[in-house]
């Protein structure tokens, strides 16, 4: 897949873009340890529907540089906002997992650049754990994702536990691509650094400032939430989102259930306000 890059402090972030330059912009943001190809089904449908679609890799992931010292929701949100400005926003932001948290933070920070949110498996707050519990998890990530076994462990966890339920026809291909990407020492090092730094507390602190229309998909089998239904209800209340609970799906509704995510997303986008040119109107800057 061909890609371009945008310069950021400490390195370049990779993205691919398709669709007419004057079409309404949609930016797709993957989650931790994932690649922009996670949006394969949704990106194709959005482009076919007439949208301009940009899919980005996270810092240190995929085709992005592996030179970053700062990772997480806020850093990712800054990268996404820079990309929206570079491509000529506003844009609808579509994010998975921590990418969803970054999208929500971006909407609070720059409502003039964010016309809507579509979130899958959204992390908008940290799980309820003690400080000691969080420290143990971070330490375990450091050990589990070390060389030479780290790429294999992550691929197995992504392809198994985090993808419980139904799978895309290209599931095995995607998991193999993740393992190949993480087999590179620099990429795996960046992934471990992200695991150690990641917190969604900055997002939770700003959910009350998110005013843009939002749609969220939560898998009923998502192991990242102790009670996915309760988490979905909290997300709906916190940001005023329409929440779709997806059966037989875990953390990746975008490729586990495209038959649910694609039509609902297209309907959501169709219902958003448009300017005279058909593009998203700019909101007020915070």
Please place each PLM-identified region on the residue numbering.
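Flexible "cap/lid" loop of the alpha/beta hydrolase fold
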Residues: 108, 115-146
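Active-site loop/oxyanion-hole signature of alpha/beta-hydrolase fold enzymes
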Residues: 16, 48, 52-94, 98, ...
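Conserved alpha/beta-hydrolase catalytic His-Asp/Glu region
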Residues: 128-130, 148-208
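Conserved HGGG/HGGXW glycine-rich cap/lid loop of the alpha/beta-hydrolase fold
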Residues: 17-63
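Conserved alpha/beta-hydrolase "nucleophile elbow" surrounding the catalytic nucleophile
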Residues: 30-32, 95-100
């Amino acid at each position: 897949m061909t890609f371009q890059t945008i310069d950021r402090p400490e390195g370049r972030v990779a993205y691919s873009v398709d669709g007419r330059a004057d079409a309404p912009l949609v930016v797709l943001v993957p989650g931790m340890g994932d690649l922009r190809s996670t949006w394969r089904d949704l990106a194709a449908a959005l482009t076919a529907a007439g949208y301009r679609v940009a899919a980005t890799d996270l810092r240190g992931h995929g085709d992005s540089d592996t030179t970053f010292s700062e990772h997480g929701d806020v850093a990712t949100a800054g990268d996404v906002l820079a990309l929206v400005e570079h491509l000529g926003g506003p844009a609808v932001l579509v994010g998975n997992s921590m990418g969803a948290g970054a999208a929500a933070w971006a909407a609070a920070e720059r409502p003039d650049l964010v016309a809507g949110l579509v979130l899958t498996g959204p992390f908008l707050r940290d799980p309820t754990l003690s400080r000691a519990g969080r420290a143990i998890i971070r330490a375990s990530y450091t050990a589990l994702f070390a060389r030479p076994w780290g790429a294999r462990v992550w691929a197995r966890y992504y392809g198994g536990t985090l993808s419980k339920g139904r799978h895309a026809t290209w599931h095995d291909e995607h998991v193999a691509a993740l393992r190949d990407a993480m087999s590179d020492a620099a990429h795996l090092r960046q992934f471990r650094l992200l695991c150690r730094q990641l917190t969604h507390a900055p997002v939770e602190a700003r959910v009350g400032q998110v005013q843009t229309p939002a749609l969220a998909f939560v898998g009923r089998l998502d192991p990242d939430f102790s009670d996915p239904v309760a988490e979905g209800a909290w997300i709906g209340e916190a940001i005023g989102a329409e929440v779709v609970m997806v059966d037989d799906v875990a953390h990746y509704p975008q490729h586990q259930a495209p038959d649910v995510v694609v039509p609902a997303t297209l309907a959501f986008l169709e219902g958003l306000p448009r300017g005279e040119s058909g593009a998203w109107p700019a909101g007020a800057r915070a």
